[in-house]
Regions:
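Conserved "boundary/linchpin" sites in short secondary-structure elements
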Residues: 1-12, 30-36, 66-78, 87-101, ...
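Conserved short loop/turn motifs at secondary-structure junctions
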Residues: 16-17, 48-49, 77
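Soluble non-cytosolic domains of exported or imported proteins
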Residues: 15-23, 80-84
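Surface-exposed patches in mature extracellular/periplasmic domains of secreted proteins
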Residues: 39-49, 104-105
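Short loop/turn motifs at secondary-structure junctions and domain boundaries
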Residues: 42, 50-57, 110
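Short hydrophobic beta-strand micro-motif common in sensory/regulatory domains
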Residues: 59-61
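Charged, alpha-helical coiled-coil and linker scaffolds that mediate dimerization/oligomerization
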Residues: 18-19, 23, 27, 33, ...
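Charge-dense, E/K-rich amphipathic alpha-helical interfaces
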Residues: 6-9, 47-51
Length: 133
């Protein structure tokens, strides 16, 4: 999970219990993380780090699910600056779907589920990534 200006540790203790649907989003996050290979995609394009430099990349995807958890629409709402990383984020959500048993309370008046998902690729000597909602 990425939080600006918060050091990474074993756990980030937030008031998660007040988030009604955290279990669903944790499942979504785990499914997407299994598919997301931004570090591999990045290293294939820039194995030495000389092309794109050492700059962390952050993008967000606006996700719309059908009531059964299948993907209806994906939209890159914040670009990372590298199209191939944004494409990888979209691909990973598509491949991870469907997201079974979405809570009824997440459905909007249109019967669809809308949320934004973030992808943070930390570029150091060895790229690392974090996925968050």
């Amino acid at each position: 999970d990425y939080l600006r200006d918060v050091d990474e540790g074993e756990k980030t203790l937030l008031n998660r219990k007040t988030e009604r649907y955290w279990a669903f989003f944790d499942r979504v996050k785990l499914q997407i993380a299994e598919e997301y290979s931004a570090h591999k995609v990045y290293q294939r394009r820039d194995p030495t780090g000389n092309i794109y430099g050492v700059k962390d990349r952050y993008s967000t995807i606006r996700v719309t699910l059908n009531s059964d958890g299948s993907v209806r629409q994906l939209h890159v709402s914040r670009r990372s600056g590298l199209d191939f990383l944004d494409d990888e984020a979209v691909r990973s959500v598509r491949e991870a779907a469907p997201f079974h048993n979405p809570p009824e309370g997440l459905k909007d008046q249109d019967g669809l589920i809308h949320f934004t998902f973030g992808f943070y690729l930390e570029i150091t000597n060895e790229p690392n990534f974090r996925i968050f909602r």
